[in-house]
């Protein structure tokens, strides 16, 4: 893929690495739905694992960038905005339409974004001035 910048390559690798445990977790959801407490705890745990992994991986790329979770106020200046499991309700009910989403904000504008659905292995990404693409 010649259209990938080195920065986008790092972001894609970080998101895919953070997503790696989600396929196993997703396959367990249906089995756990009969036990409401353990099921809810499991979903919260899966979300937390992805959140921590994203913070670790994105911190390696740009250690000076704060990380905001989608729906919370963004810090001033440049930052990553993440949705560790976008479509959490779908994930929680065993519906494979969920994703990990990451946006890069610089100078008040989105300069790069990734949406990755680990259940279908579909990845969409965009970078300012370079276009938007679907991997594969």
List where the protein language model places each region.
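Anionic-ligand binding region
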Residues: 136
